């Protein structure tokens, strides 16, 4: 086993440990621990009944499942799981469709992606930043 260990606590009999859908999958699927309904044009926090500790030097990013977005208009809200968070992980979902979205216990509702972090960057306040080719262009400015 490598030094990278994702420690998972199942908080009830309904919690399901994250799994990878394929050998090369970037993320681990996260499962709903209960039936839940996200109302049309609404939002909700889906229970998972799991807690986890990510490997040292990483954080867990809760990311959307592309199939939910394309097929049902479901988006995943912001989710950053720090290494020292030990509570239940819940998944924030937004329903952008005109009909209620039903989740069944055991459905995959998001994915967990482990990302490396730089935790020792020094913050230095400066008078100005160096010029770059891009400059202050943002929000699609490079795709002209």
UniProtKB/Swiss-Prot annotation:
Enumerate the UniProt keywords alphabetically. Hydrolase, Magnesium, Metal-binding, Nucleotide metabolism
Which domain of life does the UniProt lineage start with? Answer: Eukaryota
Q: Name one GO biological process term.
A: dITP catabolic process
Residues the entry annotates as binding dUMP: 66, 79, 82, 85, 90, 134, 139-140
Q: What is its EC number?
A: 3.6.1.23
Q: List the disulfide bonds in this chain.
A: none
Q: Which InterPro entries match?
A: dUTPase (IPR008181), dUTPase-like (IPR029054), dUTPase-like_sf (IPR036157), dUTPase_trimeric (IPR033704)
Query: Which Pfam families did the record assign?
Result: dUTPase (PF00692)
This protein's cofactor list reads: Mg(2+)
Top-rank EC class of the record's enzyme: hydrolase
- Catalytic activity from the UniProt record: dUTP + H2O = dUMP + diphosphate + H(+)
Which GO terms label this protein's molecular function in UniProt? dITP diphosphatase activity; dUTP diphosphatase activity; magnesium ion binding
Role: Involved in nucleotide metabolism via production of dUMP, the immediate precursor of thymidine nucleotides, and decreases the intracellular concentration of dUTP so that uracil cannot be incorporated into DNA.
UniProt similarity note: Belongs to the dUTPase family.
List, alphabetically, the NCBIfam families matched. Answer: dut, PRK00601.1
Q: What do we know about how this protein assembles, alone or with others?
A: Homotrimer.
**Listed PANTHER family:** DEOXYURIDINE 5'-TRIPHOSPHATE NUCLEOTIDOHYDROLASE
Q: What is this protein called?
A: Deoxyuridine 5'-triphosphate nucleotidohydrolase
Q: Which organism is it from?
A: Candida glabrata (strain ATCC 2001 / BCRC 20586 / JCM 3761 / NBRC 0622 / NRRL Y-65 / CBS 138)
């Amino acid at each position: 086993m490598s030094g990278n260990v994702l420690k998972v606590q199942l908080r009830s009999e309904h919690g399901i440990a994250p799994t990878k859908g394929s050998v090369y999958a970037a993320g681990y699927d996260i499962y709903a621990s209960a039936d839940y309904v996200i109302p049309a044009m609404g939002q909700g926090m889906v229970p998972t009944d799991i807690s986890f500790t990510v490997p040292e030097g990483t954080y867990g990013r809760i990311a959307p499942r592309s199939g939910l977005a394309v097929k049902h208009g479901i988006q995943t809200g912001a989710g950053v799981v720090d290494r020292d968070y030990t509570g239940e992980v819940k998944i924030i979902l937004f329903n952008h469709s005109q009909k209620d979205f039903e989740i069944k216990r055991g459905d995959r509702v998001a994915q967990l992606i482990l990302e490396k972090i730089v935790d020792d960057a020094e913050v230095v306040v400066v008078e100005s930043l160096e010029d770059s080719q891009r400059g202050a262009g943002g929000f699609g400015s490079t795709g002209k």
